[in-house]
Amino acid sequence: ILESTKGSKYTVLRPTLEDFVVEMPRGAQVIYPKDLAPMCMLGDIYPGVRVFETGIGSGALSMTMLRWGAHITGFELREDFLNRAVNNVKSFLGEEALSRYEVSLGDSYEDCPEGEFDRVMLDLPEPWRVTPTAEKILVPGGLMVAYTPSITQAVQVRESMGKGWVDQRTLEVLHRT
């Protein structure tokens, strides 16, 4: 509680992750909190889970998964977006979070990350182009979540998945206040 020079008292609160995501510096369009929570729930994000994230943008999904304890390896095509995401992570979650956040410039349509992952999280204009990569890098039983703002994109992702995937779902989230 702070007191002004005129004697008024104010309670100063730390912003929540939701507050920060909505107001943070950004270059790319962000995934909003109404979608971040279901993505992390359906992606079964937990402490220690190894995630490959691509299309990092301003880092909203990254911060949410890091807050839930994930270890993230990520690709971002644009250096300005990558730098913004790293700065946003550091600003809100602190320096410690960067030890679980290995992101680099990369084109996930062309490049494949090293290693195996428990989860693949996609926020790209054409996520169906990364489905073959996801199949290669996911451990058996691994999960892929694709954020697709249009139904056309969602259909193309589903069609790209083939029969080797279990529990394919399309979910629309509506938030009313």
Give the label of every model feature segment.
Residues 1-14:
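N-terminal auxiliary segments of SAM/dcSAM-dependent transferases
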Residues 23-37:
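Conserved SAM-binding loop and adjacent beta-strand
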Residues 41-46, 112-114, 136-137:
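Glycine-rich helix-loop-beta junction characteristic of Rossmann-like nucleotide cofactor-binding loops
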Residues 46-57:
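Conserved class I S-adenosyl-L-methionine
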Residues 58-69:
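Conserved SAM-binding loop of SAM-dependent methyltransferases across substrates and taxa
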Residues 67-73, 140, 165:
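Conserved S-adenosyl-L-methionine
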Residues 75-127:
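S-adenosyl-L-methionine
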Residues 128-177:
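C-terminal substrate-binding/active-site "lid" region of AdoMet-derived donor-dependent transferases
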